[in-house]
């Protein structure tokens, strides 16, 4: 395996690998989500308190997808997941222990499994990998994200 592996179309199996490999923390970044996030967190061997989600809520989505997203977020919070909000987030990533990730265009939804998407599997420790800056940026976004979407700047 190389440090960056392209994944055309559906990244689900790679997301699952990353979720199952988590040893200390698993974080998902996604502006759009559904029960897929719950499923991936359930497949992770860690407790709910070691799981995190970063999403955006800076525009009101009154569609069924937006309603589903709110239901899933409320369930995650009840389960003990650390849910944070980052205005204008558009990145899609699942990150295990800040050293393995899948980053790409695919939202964490069941619908996106049938879309034309491209993602990349990243491994910080593969020979020749120079991905420290990438994982540092994701970690900075995690730290930057707030816990209350009501406080977000809506500019």
Kindly give the residue locations of the regions a language model identified.
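Short glycine-/acidic-enriched loop or helix-start segments at secondary-structure transitions
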Residues: 37-38, 95, 112-113
């Amino acid at each position: 395996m190389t440090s960056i592996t392209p994944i055309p179309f559906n990244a689900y199996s790679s997301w699952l690998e990353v979720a199952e490999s988590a040893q200390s923390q698993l974080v998902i970044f996604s502006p759009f989500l559904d029960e897929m996030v719950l499923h991936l967190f359930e497949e992770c061997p860690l407790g709910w308190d070691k799981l995190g989600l970063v999403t955006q809520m800076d525009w009101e989505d009154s569609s069924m997808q937006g309603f589903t997203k709110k239901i899933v977020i409320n369930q995650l919070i009840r389960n003990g997941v650390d849910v944070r909000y980052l205005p204008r987030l558009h990145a899609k990533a699942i990150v295990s222990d800040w050293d393995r990730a899948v980053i790409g265009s695919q939202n964490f939804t069941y619908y996106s499994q049938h879309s034309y998407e491209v993602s990349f599997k990243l491994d910080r420790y593969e020979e020749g990998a120079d991905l420290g800056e990438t994982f540092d940026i994701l970690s900075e976004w995690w730290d930057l994200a707030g816990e209350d979407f009501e406080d977000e700047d809506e500019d």
